[in-house]
């Protein structure tokens, strides 16, 4: 297959020819960084191609189950295809539906999302649904919905543009959730952070903060990025 049709990782292939959202660094970072310790039930909101869900399946053992939710029909079908074709298909389940309308009858230990941007001031992920829903939904809406499905000791992790992440952290202060982890993503050494992975919990624990730099001053992958992604990238 050509790169326009999909992306080959070490243990799985992600087809994205039918999905507006292609494989990108944001999804790879979320799938590689999300804290999987003691997580048996995981949910990926707005899964797109299913990339993050499949990465989490690779990182966890046979006792962990991963559910994924996607509204857009083409993306949903692509995610189903990718999950079925992976070596982890028996632990992956893709559902079609709107995050704000869907009903899960279980709790999750980890809920992750690389969500639409929900803002005219930020570049859209180009999903067909974004244009229709951006005016009525927000990242806070998704966070509050995720809270309903969160196990008592569970964690929610979103990857967002830096300003959107800061806004969500501020908005979350009255949500009954606590921001427990912040990972600032810096594309190149010396630049300001452009992305952030923010994690929330119902438990008020000390905030953990860290930074990840992707490229060094010579435009080479940093050692930290290599270590983080070497289980996934073919040539890492």
From Swiss-Prot:
Q: Which GO terms describe its molecular function?
A: nucleic acid binding; tRNA (adenine-N6)-methyltransferase activity
The record's keywords, sorted A to Z, are:
Cytoplasm, Methyltransferase, S-adenosyl-L-methionine, Transferase, tRNA processing
Isomerase keyword on record:
no
Q: Which Gene3D superfamilies match?
A: Vaccinia Virus protein VP39
Q: What is its EC number?
A: 2.1.1.223
Q: Where in the cell is it found?
A: Cytoplasm
Q: Is the Methyltransferase keyword given for this protein?
A: yes
Q: What is this protein called?
A: tRNA1(Val) (adenine(37)-N6)-methyltransferase
Q: Which organism is it from?
A: Actinobacillus pleuropneumoniae serotype 7 (strain AP76)
